[in-house]
Swiss-Prot record:
GO terms for biological process: L-tryptophan biosynthetic process. Disulfide bonds: none annotated. It comes from the Bacteria. Belongs to the TrpF family. The keyword Amino-acid biosynthesis applies. GO terms for molecular function: phosphoribosylanthranilate isomerase activity. Pfam families: PRAI. This is N-(5'-phosphoribosyl)anthranilate isomerase. The keyword Amino-acid biosynthesis applies. It is an enzyme of class 5 (isomerase). Its EC number is 5.3.1.24. Pathway: Amino-acid biosynthesis; L-tryptophan biosynthesis; L-tryptophan from chorismate: step 3/5.
Length: 210
């Protein structure tokens, strides 16, 4: 299972989290986010990581030009679109960056939210399901209704996100079969400041199901 720790802002923490066994680090490229980090600071962190660890840039309603600007500086391995991007825009991103993994995030409010995913499946590589919040796009600490996902089989790899913590992750995964999990606030002391002990606990708990 892929384990993505999102909202990395400090090089030392990124290195430590990768060394513990996380398979992906997420960098928030959204200026209004408290976890924002610019491309000039992302690249030095990426350079210290093993090549087996994915570096994912998280964008929300950004233009193609903005995304391209970040990628000219930071050698990301994946682009996560966490806003209201249309299938047409996702297609454009994939055409512009065919060598990168394209992840589309969806904020799940009701079962109807899952229906909207269908039109994206053919134009992206990976899905990410997050909790719905009317005011924030992610990192809210809110959990989504895991029961809605009991029969979720999208035909694409997918991440489970939304309020996951070391304490609730095993319960969240009961009856679900995501290809990965994504945590941010659940392993933090404050936005952008990761708690290495919590990451350690998370990975130890995940080993119990393997």
């Amino acid at each position: 299972m892929r384990v993505k720790i999102c909202g990395i802002t400090q090089a030392e923490q990124g290195q430590a989290i990768a060394a513990l066994g996380a398979t992906a680090l997420g960098f928030i490229c959204v200026e209004r986010s408290p976890r924002y980090i610019n491309a000039q600071k992302i690249q030095p962190i990426i350079q210290t990581l093993p090549t087996t660890v994915d570096s994912i840039g998280v964008f929300a309603n950004a233009s193609l030009t903005d995304i391209e600007g970040v990628l000219k500086v930071a050698q990301l391995t994946a682009i996560q679109l966490h806003g209201e991007e249309t299938p047409e825009f996702c297609t454009q991103v994939k055409q512009l960056f065919p060598h990168l993994e394209i992840i589309k995030a969806f904020r799940i409010k009701t079962s109807k939210s899952l229906v909207n995913i269908c039109e994206y499946v053919e134009v992206i590589d990976t899905l990410l399901l997050d909790a719905y919040d009317p005011h924030q796009l992610g990192g809210t600490g809110k959990t989504l209704n895991w029961d809605l996902l009991r029969n979720f089989h999208p035909g694409r790899p997918w991440f489970l996100a939304g309020g996951l913590t070391p304490d609730n992750v095993l319960h969240a995964l009961e009856g679900l079969s995501p290809d990965g999990i994504d945590l941010s606030s659940g392993v933090e002391r404050s936005p952008g400041d990761k708690d290495i002990l919590k990451v350690t606990q998370l990975l130890e708990n995940l080993r119990k199901i393997n």
